[in-house]
From Swiss-Prot:
Entry cofactors: Cu cation
One cellular component term from this protein's GO annotations in UniProt: extracellular region
pH-dependence annotation: Optimum pH is 5.2 with ABTS as substrate. Optimum pH is 6.8 with hydroquinone as substrate.
Coiled coil location: none
Miscellaneous comment text of the record: Displays antiproliferative activity against a number of human tumor cell lines and inhibitory activity against HIV-1 reverse transcriptase.
Record-given protein name: Laccase
UniProt KW keywords: Copper, Lignin degradation, Metal-binding, Oxidoreductase, Secreted
A GO molecular-function descriptor: metal ion binding
Regulation of its function: Activity is enhanced by Al(3+) at concentrations of 1.25-2.5 mM. Activity is reduced in the presence of Cu(2+), Hg(2+), Pb(2+), Fe(3+) and EDTA at concentrations of 1.25-5.0 mM. Activity is not significantly affected by the presence of cations such as K(+), Ca(2+), Mg(2+), Mn(2+) or Zn(2+) at concentrations of 1.25-5.0 mM.
Keyword match Glycosyltransferase: no
Family to which this protein belongs: Belongs to the multicopper oxidase family.
Length: 15
């Protein structure tokens, strides 16, 4: 799914 990669980016943003 396209949301797959997007979810990972969100987690990285929490840095």
């Amino acid at each position: 799914d396209v949301i797959g990669p997007q979810a990972q980016v969100t987690l990285a943003n929490q840095d």
